[in-house]
Amino acid sequence: QIQCPTGRIEPVDTYTDKLLRKIYRSDTFEGLSSEQVIIGFLMNPSYWGNIPFIRQTNKELPQAYSLPEGKYIRFFDVFSEDGSYLISDAVDKAYSRPAAERSRLEKDLLKLDEKINILYSLQQGKMFALFPLPGDTSGKWYSPGDDLSVYSGKDSLFVSKIMPWYLGEASDALRTGTWESAGEVLSMMNVYQQKQSATPLLTEKQVSWELFYNKARLFFWSAMGYMAVGLLL
């Protein structure tokens, strides 16, 4: 399970669905689930940085900010070879203007900036809060890329090593087709969460129902899409 920015504890699947919908406007990408896409980005940001899956639909935006044409751009499209953020000045200028006075182009630029910031945060190990802090009654969980100096002893070692370990096992599993070791690492995370979280975790039944709801919602919107296409034919 994971803690979303609002503080809710929820299945990773629910959280990654929200992230991918924000970035790509869909729960799936070319047959991959949201969880596969987001975990894939964590595993191999260099690969996913070259995949055009960041949606933007303003036709003026590419020409205005020297970006590729089309509805989707790559993460690396907004960075120069030296790592500079190419739309930084334009974003700052848009934010300096009162919201009511921003043009449609500026509003869409800020939407793109939000999507890029989500992916950048994930690349830095943030926005993926998996670790409760022992004895912390505030209920805050921490991401692998956060300042983990608040942990001590064995807890410090665990939270700093477990995610790289899992991503390594998942990478191996993609090549071998054997997910047993990756599953064991996930089980270790779950045990840690159950033991250390001051906030009650979802029960297995609650998780199952939420996953069912996620898939049912996806099926509903897919069916509506097919129905709309049928009406047009």
Regions of interest found by a model, annotated:
Residues 1-212:
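Soluble extramembrane regions of membrane proteins in the secretory/endomembrane system
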Residues 204-233:
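Core alpha-helical transmembrane segments of integral membrane proteins
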